[in-house]
Amino acid sequence: MSIRKIFEEELSQLKTELVEMCRLTEQMISDAIEALVNRDRELGKSIAGADKRVDEYEMDIEKRCMRILLKQQPVAKDFREVSTALKMITDIERFGDQASDIGDLVYTMPGERYIKKLEHITAMGNLAEKMVRESVDSFISNNEALANEVIALDDKMDDLFLTVKKELIELIKKDGANGD
């Protein structure tokens, strides 16, 4: 098998693992939001196990990337693909950690009702799932237009965050506490 063929096979395996990591992280985000909205303590607790698997994916993919860089010494486009994968796994792993943190929070929350419906939180979770999925899809398919759409979605996420923050400040002010 030629060196180029070996490289292409290793890159294909890298992309397959990256997609698997992404799909698991998407599910974790979905589960975290579902657990939060429904106050499902057991679902919240279960997310930690998936987070361990995402951590394993990160280590495995990082090793694969390093092996490719050291053995194949890619240049130009090939190097960018491997270095982009390294950056992506760090971000995807962080998303998994954050989903796990939400799960832990749900597990330890008291059983009181929410004072407000979590509609914007649900929208943020759905948007986060879409961003993770489309980020990896744009990388796998080398689709710059899709990557730019993900960047635009980040602005929507920022807007949702500001909306939630303002609503929380208003709720705190109504309660008589200092909302600033």
Give each language-model segment a name.
Residues 1-180:
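Cytosolic, long alpha-helical scaffolding segments
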